[in-house]
Amino acid sequence: MSRVGKLPITIPEGVKVGLNDLEVKISGPKGELSKTFKGNIAIIMEENKLVVKPLAVNKNARAMWGTARSIICNMITGVKEGFKLKLEINGVGYRAMVKGKYLNLMLAKSHNTKIEIPSNIKIDLPKQNIILLEGIDKEKLGQFASIIIKQRPPEPYKGKGIKFENKFIQRKEGKKN
């Protein structure tokens, strides 16, 4: 029995949920999200709650049970409140700029890195070394953040690179003579 999957999802005020077989459409004050689920699960609306139930007893149905419930819960939170991620850029001369629909990163390479900003993600740069990402889709926001971090992941000796704000980087000692 899935500990996550068996919990019902309460639908808050201001959020509308539409069900069509395994397609879930959720709209709220921040926007609209839709997702089609695959697998042996059933999504049922009871009063002001959504319930996800497995249709079979096999391993795939049990795996999708908790996953589908978590994804739907994240969709509801996204359209109601939204998600925010904060990235830090550490290093001399490392900085970020937004030009049009591109994020321009200067990361001590022979060229500047340009990354196209997805349409449903907003970027704010309070400082040159801090990137604030905001969006309603938690999955796409995390994927975009990982694309940015992949350009220059933090290294353990000097701590240079791009990382999540609250992530601790285990530092290593350099060579000794």
From Swiss-Prot:
Keyword Glycosyltransferase set for record: no
HAMAP family (UniProt xref): Ribosomal_uL6_B
Gene from which the chain derives: rplF
Biological classification of the source: Bacteria, Pseudomonadati, Pseudomonadota, Alphaproteobacteria, Rickettsiales
SUPFAM superfamilies linked to this entry: Ribosomal protein L6
Superkingdom: Bacteria
GO biological process: cytoplasmic translation
Subunit composition and interactions: Part of the 50S ribosomal subunit.
Protein's recorded name: Large ribosomal subunit protein uL6
Family note: Belongs to the universal ribosomal protein uL6 family.
Gene3D superfamilies registered for this protein in UniProt: Ribosomal protein L6, alpha-beta domain (3.90.930.12)
The protein's role, per its UniProt record: This protein binds to the 23S rRNA, and is important in its secondary structure. It is located near the subunit interface in the base of the L7/L12 stalk, and near the tRNA binding site of the peptidyltransferase center.
Example of a GO cellular component annotation carried by this entry: ribonucleoprotein complex
Molecular functions (GO terms): rRNA binding; structural constituent of ribosome
Entry keyword set: Ribonucleoprotein, Ribosomal protein, RNA-binding, rRNA-binding
